[in-house]
A protein has these predicted regions:
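Conserved cytosolic headpiece of P-type ATPases
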Residues: 1-205
């Protein structure tokens, strides 16, 4: 009977990644410095792009074991994006020490604390030690959530206030990505010492 009923179905709706697909995701586009780019167009020589990539692989629980990426599909896609950038740069620019493995970066910049993602906050944050005693919080999550938590936006040459003009540009790009069937994540950070708390997921850039 169930099979007969299924034969009459013309549309199946599902909100679970992997139900009807391969449970695999890939980073298609990145919006940085007021413009979009593909992962293979990014470079570790750009300080803004490099900082974004560090955010993507550090505030991330996916890992590589025996050449396979293991973990949440979204976080796995971010890890694969970093390798795509790194391998492409190896082929085209041969910049040596900049093209280091994500494992090396994770060892150089250790995770001190984390607040895992949950459906209420719609974001995930981790704290790291960069240079000496300097500590930084990396956050990723839903665009609308992080927009409300950010006070600045980073460009290659400057940090600008998150005013109505910047908010409108980001919202427009978010809508464009969504209309093209892409899942959209926002990334932010801030320097902060002391214990990592939910309250510190504010005042971000």
């Amino acid at each position: 009977k169930a099979v007969e009923s299924l034969g009459c179905v013309s549309v199946i709706c599902s909100d679970k990644t992997g139900t009807l697909t391969q449970n695999k995701m890939h980073v298609e586009e990145v919006y940085l410095n007021g413009m979009t780019c593909k992962p293979d167009e990014m470079t570790l020589e750009s300080s803004l792009q490099r900082f974004f990539l560090y955010n993507a692989i550090l505030n991330n629980d996916a890992s590589i074991t025996d050449g396979k990426v293991l973990g949440d599909p979204t976080e796995s896609a971010l890890l694969e994006m970093f390798h795509e950038v790194r391998l492409n740069q190896d082929r085209t620019e041969n910049v040596g020490q900049l093209t280091i493995q994500e494992e090396t970066i994770r060892n150089m910049i250790p995770r001190l604390e984390e607040i895992p993602f949950d459906s209420e906050r719609k974001c995930m944050s981790s704290k790291y030690r960069l240079h000496g005693e300097e500590e930084i919080i990396f956050t990723k999550g839903a665009v609308d959530v992080l927009l409300n938590r950010c006070i600045n936006v980073a460009y290659e040459e400057e940090i600008r206030p998150m005013d109505n003009v910047e908010i409108a540009k980001i919202q427009k790009q978010n809508q464009h990505f969504s209309e093209n069937g892409l899942r959209v994540l926002a990334f932010a950070c801030k320097k902060s010492g002391g214990e990592l708390t939910v309250e510190k997921e504010n005042g971000l850039t």
